Every structure is written in C-alpha cells, then in structure tokens.
Amino acid sequence: MQLHNLYPFPEERKTRRRVGRGSGSGLGCTAGKGHKGQNARAGGGVAPGFEGGQMPLQRRLPKHGFKNAPFKVTYDVINLDRLLEAFEGKDTITLDDIYARGLARMGAPVKILSRGEVKSALKVEAHKFSQTAAEKIRGAGGEVSELEAVPAA
C-alpha cells in the first residue's frame, strides 16, 4: 500500500457547493433559500421546537416525573496517594487543609478514594470515604472522620 493508492481518490470526493456565485451555477440568485421570509435572511430560522406560533409539543404534553437536580451532591474526589503527597509528615488532615492546598474546590464536598498506601497513623476529615480508603487509614492506626455533605444549591 502506498499513499497514491489510498481511498478516496481526489476525483471521488464531492466538492462543496459554492452558493450565490452566478445564475449559471444553478445556485446563484437566492442561493437555494427560496424567496424572502425568515429563513431567507442572514441568521434566519426558527428556534428548535418552534411550531409557527402553535402551542409546541413540549408544552402541550404534561409534566412527568420528579426532578432531583437541586438535591444532587457532587463530590470532589481525592486519592490517598495525592493526599499523602500533599501533606507529607502531617498526622492530622482537616477539610480546611484540603481546601487551602487546592486539592478540592472551596466549599465542595470531598470524597477520599483508596489509590495509594498509608504507612503511618493519620486522622483524616472529609465528607465521604470509599470503604477501602477507610480500611487502609484505620489499618495503619489512623482515624476517619465523616462530615455531613450539603447539596451545592
């Protein structure tokens, strides 16, 4: 196989339509947009769901179900290896320390995940811990302190 054998061949590729370039081209004058009206104008067209003033389908149908978005809690996740690297030599890690180091967004709930090894006893404070992360911290003689997470609404 060589470069000149690759498909598609240049003559097989369809050329782009250049509209509004004279009546001989077949797409001159109105450039395929028809005569006048909103869709013929630059930037013209209707919004998705607009049905010409008729009550649109999404408003004719009833509301359905329950929207839980305002109560959703999204955690900033931090792995143990990153936590230990940032706080090397410290035996107590509070939430304020985590925010101050920039490991999580200020005020965001924090979850600690288990990647990495804990070698010394640590006291860690966060909103949530994965089961294995908590086991690793407790296994090294440390302490886990879970705080209550508040929805970010």
Curated annotation (Swiss-Prot):
Pfam families, sorted: Ribosomal_L27A
Cysteines joined through disulfide linkages: none
GO cellular component, one term: cytosolic large ribosomal subunit
The keyword Ribonucleoprotein belongs to this UniProt entry's keyword annotation: yes
This protein's UniProt keywords: Ribonucleoprotein, Ribosomal protein, RNA-binding, rRNA-binding
Family: Belongs to the universal ribosomal protein uL15 family.
Name of the protein this chain belongs to: Large ribosomal subunit protein uL15
GO biological process: translation
Domain of life: Bacteria
Matches recorded under HAMAP family: Ribosomal_uL15
Keyword RNA-binding: yes
UniProt signal peptide: none
Biased composition, class Gly residues, residue ranges: 21-31
